[in-house]
């Protein structure tokens, strides 16, 4: 093998190793956002739920600040249970990456029967949370709070 070929091969291997350390983008969260919009009939933008209280958004800890934050805590717990399912326990199959089939008809959410066990579980996690968000009051004072002091 020529030295130039070895350099190209080495460059490809290093690139692949670097790409392996880049986390995949959560695909399912887009669907979850659409479910939220369906359930609340578009009354509140999805981004308002991304940094609310102690549990809505990335991570979560402490005591939920209100009922809406409890919806997010329950959703986080549901995703945790999904990750324990054998059907969801393979690469890129967990709750953040697995997409599912559902329908939205005039605010009514239905997870379709063609979902496998993992997708059905995740769909129901998202459906339950979206319905909870729609029926629970939103307190602007709990958006973008200091989680280090309040949670």
UniProtKB/Swiss-Prot annotation:
Ca(2+) binds at residues 55, 57, 59, 76. Its EC number is 3.1.1.4. GO terms for biological process: arachidonate secretion; fatty acid biosynthetic process; lipid catabolic process; phospholipid metabolic process; positive regulation of fibroblast proliferation. The active site is at residues 75, 126. It is an enzyme of class 3 (hydrolase). The keyword Disulfide bond applies. It is found in: Secreted. GO terms for molecular function: calcium ion binding; calcium-dependent phospholipase A2 activity; phospholipid binding; signaling receptor binding; toxin activity. Its cofactor is Ca(2+). Keywords: Calcium, Disulfide bond, Hydrolase, Lipid degradation, Lipid metabolism, Metal-binding, Secreted, Signal, Toxin. It comes from the Eukaryota. SMART domains: PA2c. Expressed by the venom gland. Belongs to the phospholipase A2 family. Group I subfamily. D49 sub-subfamily. This is Acidic phospholipase A2 1. It comes from Tropidechis carinatus.
């Amino acid at each position: 093998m020529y030295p130039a070929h070895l350099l190209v091969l080495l460059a490809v291997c290093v690139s692949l190793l670097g790409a392996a350390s880049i986390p995949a983008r959560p695909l399912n969260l887009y669907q979850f956002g659409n479910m939220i919009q369906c359930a609340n009939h578009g009354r509140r933008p999805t981004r308002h739920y991304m940094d609310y209280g102690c549990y809505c958004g990335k991570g979560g800890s402490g005591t939920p600040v209100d009922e809406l934050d409890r919806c997010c805590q329950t959703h986080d717990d549901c995703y945790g249970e999904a990750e324990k399912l054998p059907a969801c326990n393979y690469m890129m199959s967990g709750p953040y990456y697995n997409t599912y089939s559902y329908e939205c008809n005039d605010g009514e959410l239905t997870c379709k029967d063609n979902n496998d066990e993992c997708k059905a579980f995740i769909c129901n996690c998202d459906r339950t949370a979206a319905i909870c968000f729609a029926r629970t009051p939103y307190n602007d004072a709990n958006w973008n709070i200091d989680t280090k002091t309040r949670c």
